[in-house]
Amino acid sequence: MEIKIIQNYILYLIKDCGLSVSLHPFQDETLITGSTLMNFNIHDNSYCSYIKSLPNGHKECVSQQKKVFNQCCQTNENFCDICYAGVKEYIYLLHNKESIIGFVSVSGYACDNKEKYISFISEQFDCNLDSVSREYNKLKANMPDKKRIDTLILPLCKMLELAYLKEIKDPQAASLNEAICHYIQRHYSIDLTTDLICEKFSCSKSYFSHSFKSYTGKSFR
């Protein structure tokens, strides 16, 4: 399934349905990490952005996310949880047969005992209590009904799982696309052209154009 279709559906969930959706792949999963879907690898609410802006805030969030990965592997089912900073979220697992390849998060909701978390964050990062409280209160107060979220998010999970299966059926193409994406990222300051990339990776222009768009969801240049 085209990356662009998945991307458009996520944008629909965010803009039209008012959901804060983010994608969190495991390290060896390249469908998301090697495409424009990585743009959705972050919680977009102002409270989470505020915490990540604090000294060691981003590092702590990454560390805590590993615990979510572990919980995914232990439970092997979708669940609702509260992160260390007090943000309530739905977690939907992404599977490849018996293996878990990542998860989808629907986040950005305040919990009932917010004062405990606000105080904890203020002490943890040695920051102003009022500032933390002000940012926390920007979170959404009411969490949507799980049946509604299931109806919207489960199709996204299926799209991602099918796209992942399509990718691993052609590992050579996936590996080449991943290598090309990494090369472009490493040499972003150079005026890269289609000719240069095709020469570097010994592929035709037509193959590169079609494969790159299918893999990333956008045309090169």
What does each of the following model-derived ranges do?
Residues 1-16, 20, 103-173:
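Juxtadomain coupling helices with adjacent low-complexity linkers
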Residues 7-87:
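Structured interaction and signal-relay segments at domain junctions
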Residues 186-190:
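Short helix-capping/hinge SLiMs at alpha-helix to coil transitions
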